[in-house]
Amino acid sequence: MKNFLKLNVKEKNIQIADQVIIDETAGEVVIGANTRICHGAVIQGPVVIGANCLIGNYAFIRPGTIISNGVKIGFATEIKNAVIEAEATIGPQCFIADSVVANQAYLGAQVRTSNHRLDQQPVSVRAPEGIIATGCDKLGCYIGQRSRLGVQVIILPGRIISPNTQLGPRVIVERNLPPGTYSLRQELIRTGD
């Protein structure tokens, strides 16, 4: 595939910076037209990256990832076995694993999706019809379309964030959230002189 990419980069207007690693040992890497892969990124197939995407410096795209058209991935973000739908933006230093990020969602810097339970039990999902036992040891979350997540949001395994939801910085998503705006209440206490 590296040879294919090298032969068709100009034709498809794909920009691959120096020191990018495209590893097809485990599967093919497909990159769409007008996509830019920045310095130091690592992509391990099988991976599909759509057209008009930006993969930031030192991003790590791991096997099983599908990135749709018009997606922006920030500096040093790691994505594993996830679906990133069209026009989503994932900020710098995020970790997205075994999850779905829906169309036009925006994730600020250092957002984390947890994908396994500390008690090593399978991840379950709470749905309107009840709890679904997935049988999966690793399962991240679903982030609804046009949702906006602030810096350092953490999402626990199997959680669902409804479309058009806004989460302020440092919110920890411990349960499914209906559409709305959520933020932490913080109390600043001055101590000493």
Model-derived segments and spans:
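Extended, small-residue-rich solenoid/repeat segments and analogous flexible loops
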Residues: 1-58
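Short, functionally important structural connectors and interaction interfaces within domains
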Residues: 8, 41, 59, 69-71, ...
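Short, solvent-exposed loop/turn positions at domain surfaces
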Residues: 23-25, 43, 61, 95, ...
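Glycine-rich hexapeptide-repeat left-handed beta-helix
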Residues: 75-76, 81-193
